[in-house]
Amino acid sequence: EQVMQYGEDDLTFVSRLLSEVGIWFRFATDARLKIEVVEFYDDQSGYERGLTLPLRHPSGLFDGETEAVWGLNTAYSVVEKSVTTRDYNYRTATAEMMTEQHDATGGDNTTYGEAYHYADNFLQKGDKEAAESGAFYARIRHERYLNEQAILQGQSTSSLLMPGLEIRVQGDDAPAVFRKGVLITGVTASAARDRSYELTFTAIPYSERYGYRPALIPRPVMAGTLPARVTSTVKNDIYAHIDKDGRYRVNLDFDRDTWKPGYESLWVRQSRPYAGDTYGLHLPLLAGTEVSIAFEEGNPDRPYIAGVKHDSAH
């Protein structure tokens, strides 16, 4: 119904929205403009490539002046074989909204089971290429599961390691997955008087079939209701601004921004005691009336008018 920020700072809010659609970002320096920029990617085109390091453990403070990696570890988990999503859209209430099982592995027989997710906030079933459709979310979710299938770790003296970098490790003793190429997803740097500079990194196997997906940041859970007032496009209007589907626009009390009158929110549905295709009960609300806004499954993006209240002004 809308996109709402509540109880979260700006970075968390933006990161949450990006994580839901599988977009990751990084900070970089624009060499031409000489300014810091933020780059957003959702596929392998954003990876940095071309770094190959040998497998070699440094000796104390002496690393032979050669950047290398060591202490390589791999951890494997069985993840879901496919993902199915489903949602409900009252605008097309009879439309089939459950997607087919999506398998992004291309036939990997080490995966098992099906993950079923409801209410991913999509309006149509669509296909895997249709942005923010049911099939799109099924694909993104399965790729996120596959990112957890193999978690790789290691240490390095290379200052070039950073998230989004693909590296290969040379050496017959290196695990095959590192020799084929891995994508760095996180780094931690450390140094001390009695130790040389080193990085601890985490990575996932590089894949052309699917890319890195950031961990899903959970939405805030809206407990109870929030107060709001029904609005209109006309000042001192006798009736509120209402559309053909009986929806209203409301001004949420916590919102500090100033909006054009009658456009403080997107259209919000109203819960009624009686409704049908050719019958129902609708008592029109007046501009300024206090209403209680509830949220489907506590989702801040799915508000509806749950009730109307008297107050000192109305």
Name these PLM-found stretches:
Residues 1-314:
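Amphipathic alpha-helical and helix-coil boundary elements used as assembly
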